[in-house]
Amino acid sequence: MNIAQPVSSEIKSVKFGIYDVDDVEKISVKQIVNPVLLDNLNHPTNGGLYDLALGPYLKNSVCATCHLDERYCPGHFGHIVLPIPAYHPLFFSQMYNLLRSTCLYCHHFKLSKVKVHLFFCRLKLLDYGLLNESEMVENVSLTEAIIKNSNGTPLEDGSDSEDSGLGHDDIAKDAATLMRIRDEFVAKSIADSRQNAHIDAQLTTLLLHERKKVVRAFYHAISSRKQCDNCQSFSPNFRKEGFAKIFEIPLSGKNLQFMEQTGKIRSDVLRDTSKKHHEDEGYDGDSDSSNESEVEGIDLFEEDPNPLKNKSKSPIAHGAKYMTSTEVRNHLRRLFVKENVVLSRLYAHKRGKPASADMFFLQNIAVPPTRFRPASKMGDEVHENIQNELLTRILQSSIQIASLSKDSTVEVNPDEKEGLERRSRAFELLINAFVQLQHDVNSLIDSNRNPSSGGQSRTVPPGIKQILEKKEGLFRKHMMGKRVNYAARSVISPDPNIETNEIGVPPVFATKLTYPEPVTLYNFNEMRNAVINGPHKWPGASHIQNEDGTLISLMPLTIEQRTALANQLLTPQSNLISSPYSYSRLINTNKKVYRHVRNGDMLILNRQPTLHKPSMMAHKARILPGEKTIRMHYANCNSYNADFDGDEMNMHFPQSTNARSEAQFIANTDSQYLVPTSGDPLRGLIQDHVVMGVWLTCKDTFYTRDEYQQLLFQALKPDETGMYGRIKTLPPAIQRPGIYWTGKQIISSVLLNLKPSDRPGLNLKSKAKVPGKYWSPDSEEGSVLFDDGELLCGILDKSSFGASAFGLVHSVHELYGPDIAGRLLSVLSRLFTAYAQMRGFTCRMDDLRLDEQGDNWRRQLLENGKSFGLEAASEYVGLSTDSPIALLNANLEEVYRDDEKLQGLDAAMKGKMNGLTSSIINKCIPDGLLTKFPYNHMQTMTVSGAKGSNVNVSQISCLLGQQELEGRRVPLMVSGKSLPSFVPYETSAKSGGFIASRFLTGIAPQEYYFHCMAGREGLIDTAVKTSRSGYLQRCLMKHLEGLCVQYDHTVRDSDGSIVQFHYGEDSLDVTKQKHLTQFEFSAKNYKSLIQKYKVKSVLSAVDSETASSYAKKALKKPYKYDPVLDKYPPSRYLGSVSEKFQRAVDEYTQKNPDKLIASKKESKLDDSLLNESKFKALMQLRYQQSLVDPGESVGVLASQSIGEPSTQMTLNTFHFAGFGAKNVTLGIPRLREIIMTASANIQTPTMTLRLNDGVSDKRASAFCKEVNKLVLSEVVRQVRVTEKISGQGSDEQSKTYAIRLDLYSRDEYQDEYGVLQEEIESTFSNRFLKILNRIIKSYLAKSKQRKSGGKDDTVPEVGQALKPLEDIDEAPIEGRAQEALEDEDNDATNEKMVSRSKQHASYEGPDEADKVALRQLKGSNKVEDVNMDEEEDEGFKSDESVSDFKERKLLEKQNTVSISERRELQLKTAKEILSNCKHLDFDYVNGEWATVELVFPINTEKLLMVSLVEKACSETVIHEIPGITRCFSKPPDSALDTVPKVITEGVNLKAIWEFYNEISMNDIYTNDIAAILRIYGVEAARNAIVHEVSSVFGVYGIAVDPRHLSLIADYMTFEGGYKAFNRMGIEYNTSPFAKMSFETTCHFLTEAALRGDVDDLSNPSSRLVVGRVGNFGTGSFDIFTPVVDSPAN
C-alpha cells in the first residue's frame, strides 16, 4: 500500500442480480441508434457504437462525458432499446419451464395453493437457516389433521375435490386454515431462533444442499400437472424451437370439449395492456409505452390472426401457434403477480420490490464502454473490435422491425385482395424479423445459441459467455492469475559453491529488477550511491518516487544531474503546499528510491509445473558478475523437480515489506526441507557428492595437517559465513608414524563448527545405504553412529545427507532447526566438491565387465533356461514337455483365440522368465564382476545411491530381461508371429520379447525392436498422463482451497462447515511429526531438546496436570471416557495427545529397549538422569510443539499431496489379480474414478471375502461355483440346425428349423459348474426359448428395415454405434423439471476436438470417461437420493438363495413326475412362449442333448439360425447372483498371509449375507465405495475412500500421509453422501465466484444472478477475484499495535 495515498475502504461482499430496464437507463449515458460506426473521415458517428460519450475512441481523443483522456477515463455505458422484448438466452430454459407450469386461465401455478404454500414455508425457513424446522413443517398438516372429508379421514392434498364429499368452499376454507397454521409455525420458529440467537444468515453447504433439493422438488411438482389444481382448467402445451421461438400446441379434442362445457375463456394478454397488473407489481403504468416502440401498438390479432400461424417451416410447429415474446412476457407477468410470495423466495428481487418476470427478457441492452471494445489501428486503417459486429447486427435488426411495423399498420381496404396480401406478407416478414432479432441477441450473449452462425468457413464472434469461460476466459486468465512485473525468466545452471538457500542472479537481471526503498537517515548513503550509479551500473537505481507519488526516471539524466538529485533525497518536496494532497499527511512520508536488487534480497523462484508447495521457494539473491544464467545449488533439484538440461525458471522480486518478510521467514528454502506430502526430506546432496561422501568417510582415508585444514577452510568459508575467521579443530586421531586425521574427523569438525555453542552435540544411530558386508564380512560400517557430535562409526552416503528420512541432516534439522540444516548441506557440498578436486572420480569399461567365472555362470544359466518357454507353455495347457508338438499347437490355438487365456499364458511365461532373470543377476552381481566394490566405481555409484540402480548394472552386464507392453508380453500379428523373423506360434521366450543379451556386448535386431516398443509405450504414457493428472489436481484444488485449520483446531470450509474436529484426527502437522515416534533419538538428545523447547517458559503458559491425569483414565477405560483430545485442546493442555501416541510412549517406557531411561532407583541416586516421568513430559511437550498451525491451508496441501504423486504414476496400469480374473483398475484411471467422478458404477467392482475357519477347500470351491454366473453356452458343446421345407403347394409350405443343442456329459457339467440336469432342463424350456424368440424377432425387424431402405435414428447402420440420447444435449438436466434449474451449459464438453488439438498440457477438461460418469450422476441415481433398500433388493431379486434353489430342485426330483408328463408339460410351456414351436424334447435320461423345432411361413427371410442360437445360449443365464459374474480363490499376498480368501467380480453385498456359513460376515470388503455407502453407511464409505486411495499409491511405493487422505475422504462424505470433485460436487459450494472460476462459468453466474446470491468473499478464489488478501495463513489474523501517547516534545 502506498502510505502517501492510503485506501481506507475494501470490498466486503458481492451481490449478484439482474439489471432491469430502469437500471440500464440509469447507468447509460447515451442511447445507441446508429449502426454505422465511423463517418467518411474515420471519425466516430453520433449515436454510434464509438460515440465519444462512451469514452475516448483513440489515444488522442477526449471523452465527451467526463472530459478525461484515454488513460484516466473509466469508460461509460450506453444502451440499445429493442423494439420488442427478447428472451434472455441464459434464462430461456428457466422461463420456458415457468410458462409450462402456468395455468393460462387463472395465471396461478397448476399446483394447488396448499402445496405451493408448503414449498414457500420450507424455503422461508431455510433462508433463516432453520434446517430441522424446514423438515418439520411438512408434518404440520398430518399432526393437525386439518382437512377431513365427510367420513372423517384425512384428505390428500392432491386428491380430486370433486370425488370427495366436500364442496369447493369447504376445501378452500380448510386449505386456508392449514396455510394459516403453517404460517404460525414458521413465524414461531423464526421468533424462537431469534430469541435463542440461533439465527445464522451465513449460508452453509448443508443449507444450500437442502435448498436445492427443495427447489428441485418444487420445479418437479409444478411441471408435472396436466390440469390446474386451482381452477380445473386444461392449459395448452408448448414447444420450443432452439432458444428463439415458442409455439403453443392446441388442446386435444377431449380437453377442448371439457373447457367449452365449463365455459372458461382465456383473456387476451396481448390486447390487454392492463395497467393494474403493472401497478400491482410496483411498475409505473406507462412504463411500457416509454420503453417499447410503436411495435407494441400493433394489435397482432386485430383482423386476421392467421398470418401468425404455421409461419415456421419446421415440422415442430405443425398445427401450433407462434407466440411472440410480448405474449409470453404478459403471461409470466401475471403469474409473478399472483404467485409473488413463493417466486420472491426463488428469484432475486430488489428491496421493496417484488420479483418480476421482466428478468427473463431483454428490453434494453447495455453497451459496454469503448475502452472494453477498443478499435485497433494499423497505419491509417482502423479495424473495429469483433464485439461490435454483434451489437451492429442488433441495431440493424431493430431498425428493420421498426420499418416493417410501419408497413404492416398501413390502413387497408378490406375489399382490396392485393392490399390484404401485401399486409399479410408484411406480417410474415415482421415475424421473421422478430426471430432474427432474437438470434442476434442470443449471439451477443452466447454465440453457440445461434443456429446460423456461419458454418465452418468463418469464425463466429465470441459472445459474452465465450469471453468468460474456459482457460482463455476472463475468470481463469485474468482474474485467478495475471501476468506480473518485477519478474525474470532464464535457463538454470548448477553452482555447488553458493549456499543452498541462495540463487545466483546474472547482472542483466540485477539491473532491471528494482525495489522501492524508502529513504531514511539509516540508509541515506547507500541510496545516494545507488542514485549516482544510475540505472545501468550495479548497484544502482532506476527511479526516484517523490512524496506525492510522482516518479522521476534516472534513465535520461547525466551523472551530475543524478548526483544533485541524490543529495536532495532527505529534502522535502518543494511544491507540496500547492498540491491537492494534505500537507500534514505527506510531510511524514519518505521519498523512495527504486534500487537494484542486491545481495541478500529475497527472490521467489518457481519452476513450472508448480505441482506442490516446494515448487515455489524464496532464495537469497547473490549477484554473480559475468554470468548469463540463473545459478542454483544442486540441493534444490528435488524440490523443483529440475535438472540442468535446458530447464527454465521464473524469478519474482517481492515489492512490499510484508511480502519480503513472509518470503524470508516462511517461504525460505531452509524451511521447505520437509515435503508436506509425506513429511520426508526433499533436499539433499546428489550424484558426485554422494560418492565423495563414501570415499571421504572410508576407514582407510587419512589426511595430513595441510589437507585437513585446507578441506575445512574450503568447506566452512569462515571469512564469509559470519564465523569471523575462526575454525575449531579436533586433535589428530593418529600420532605415530605421522600425524593424521581421519575422514570421519573432518565430518565431526564440521558439526563442531556449525552447532550452536550453547547446545550439546548430536547423538544419532542410523543406517548407511552401503551394507557393511560390502566392506568386509563382519564390518560395522553399515551403521552410522554419532556421539556428542563425533562420528564414531559408519559411512556417510545418500541415507545420511541425501533426501532421506532420519539421516544426519534430517536429525540436525530436528535438533538445531532449519537454518543449521541448510548450512550443513551447503558446507558438506563444498567439502565434497573440494575432495572431488583432490581425488577425482571416473568410471571405466572394466567396471562393467564380468570376470571369466561370472561369464561362465551367466552362459550356463542362459543355456539351462533355453527350454523355459516350451516348459511354461506345456505346463499352462496341461501337457508334459515331451508331448508331440502338433498336440501342443492344437491346445495353444485355443489359448491364442481367447484373450483372457492368452493373458494367463503371458503371466505364466513372464513368471518363469523373470525367475531366470533374477537368478542370473543374483549370481553374477556383485560376485561375478571383474573389479569388486569399492574399487568398482560403477558399483560405488549404484550401491551408495549416487546414481542408477541394480537394474542399470544388470542390463549392462547381464541381460535386459522380459520386455512388457501394458503388463503383457509382446503381442502377435495376424500371422501368429511377433516379428516376421520368427516361426508362427513359436513357444520360445525370445519370440515373446525376452532379451537374453546385454548392452555391454550388444543386442540382436529383433531384441532392439522389442526394447524400442517398450520405450515408446513409456513416452506415450508420460505425455498423456501430464494432462490427466493436471486436471485431477485442479479439480481437487478448486474444491479444497477453502479448507483451513482454525484456532479451535477444527478444519472448516470457508463457509464455516466443520469438516474435521482435529486435522488428520490428531491435530499434528505432517512435517513436524516425522521424528515424533523416534523415541530413541528423543531420549539420546534429551538435553538438547529441553534447550530447544525452552521448557520453563512453556510450562508457565500451559496446564500440565489436568489433561495428563485424565488421559491415564481414558486409556484404561476407553468405553467409559471420551478421548482426551476430545475434551482438552492440545495447544493449552500438556498431555492432551492422541491415544495412539500415548500407547506408543507407554510401551516404549515399559520395554525400555535401548536402556536409555533410568529406573526409579538409578534416578534417585543421580538426579540428572532421564527417568520415565521426565521422558513422558518431554514427549508430551514434543507433541504440543508438533501441532498444526492455525491458518494452515490444509485443503491446498492435501490436493497437492494427491495431485503431485499422481504425475509419477503410470497411466493405464493393470494389476493381474490371478488367472480367470479381470484386471483391477489402478493408477490415474482409478484415482479419477474414486475422486473425480465418485462413480456409482465403477469399471472393475470386486469383493474380497474371508472364508470362515474350518471351511474345507472342497466347500470353498463349491461356494465359488454357486456364486459364479453360469450361462447356457458354457454347458453346450455344439449347436446343430437342420432347415427343411415341409407341406404341399405354395400356400401350405413352411420352413422348419430343427435345432439341437449337444451338451457336455452330465458328470462333466456337474463337477465343473455344480449345476443339476433339472436346472438346465428348466432353463432350456423357459428362459432360452424366450430369449431366442426375442432375438429372432429383432433380426427379422432389422432385415425388414434394411429392405425398405428407410433410415431410422434409433436403428444404426452396420458398423455405427447407436448414439445415446443423452449425447444429443449434454446439459446438466435432472429429469425434465431440472431444465428449470439449470441452463444447458456444456462448457467442458463443447468443442472437444479443439481442446484435444490444443492438448493444454497440464489442465485439460474432463474427458469422455468423465462425461459418461457425469451423465450417470446427472440422472436421478445420485447416491444421496438413492432409496437405500430399493436398489440392493432389486439386486437380489430371487427370493431364495442359490442353495435353496438347488434343494427345492432336488425335492422336486424326489417327487418324480414321469418323463412323458414332463415332456408334455414343457412342450405346453414352450408353445405359450413361442407359438411357432412345433416340437420340444430333452434327454431326460442322460441330460446330454436338447432339441426344439420352430416353424416359419415360407416367405420368411432366411435366418442364420446357428449364430442366433449361439447368441441366445450366451445370453441365457442358468444361475447367477445379480451383479456378480465370477468368483475365484485369492492367491496369498505374502508368505505370512495364510487366511483363505475369495474374490468376486461384481458386487452384491446383501446376497453374500446369505452365505454366512461359508463367509466371515465381519471381513467382507469391496472396492465399490458407493455400495458400501448404501449398505454400511457413511463412516464405512469414508474409511473405504482412505483405503482405496492409499492402495492406489501403494502399488507404486508412493508414501502419502494418511492425514491428507483422511481430509479428502472427510470432505467427500461430511454431508452424508459421496461427493465428487467435479462440477456436480462444487454445485453446493456457497461461493458463486469459486464455482465460476472452476468450470461452466455462465451456468453458475446465471444461477447466482437469478437467485440474487451474495458472495461474502470468505473463499480464497472469490477474494482473489476482487483483489483482497486471502483469509488463511498470515491473512487469517490482524495485528494491532498499541497506541501509546508520547509525551510532548
UniProtKB/Swiss-Prot annotation:
List localization entries. Answer: Nucleus, Nucleolus
One of this protein's GO BP terms? Answer: transcription elongation by RNA polymerase I
Residues bearing Phosphoserine are: S159, S161, S1438, S1441
One Pfam family, short name please? Answer: RNA_pol_Rpb1_2
Task: Tell me which GO cellular component terms the UniProt record holds.
Answer: cytosol; mitochondrion; nucleolus; RNA polymerase I complex
Region Disordered, residue ranges: 269-295, 1346-1440
EC? 2.7.7.6
What segments bear the compositional bias annotation Acidic residues?
281-295
Region of interest (Bridging helix), residue spans: 1005-1017
Name the principal localization, coarsely classed: nucleus
What are the binding positions for Zn(2+) in this chain? C63, C66, C73, H76
**Residues binding Mg(2+), per UniProt:** D643, D645, D647
Keyword Transcription assigned to the entry: answer is: yes
What does UniProt give as the signal peptide span? none
| Homology family | Belongs to the RNA polymerase beta' chain family.
This chain belongs to the protein called DNA-directed RNA polymerase I subunit rpa1
Q: Which organism is it from?
A: Schizosaccharomyces pombe (strain 972 / ATCC 24843) (Fission yeast)
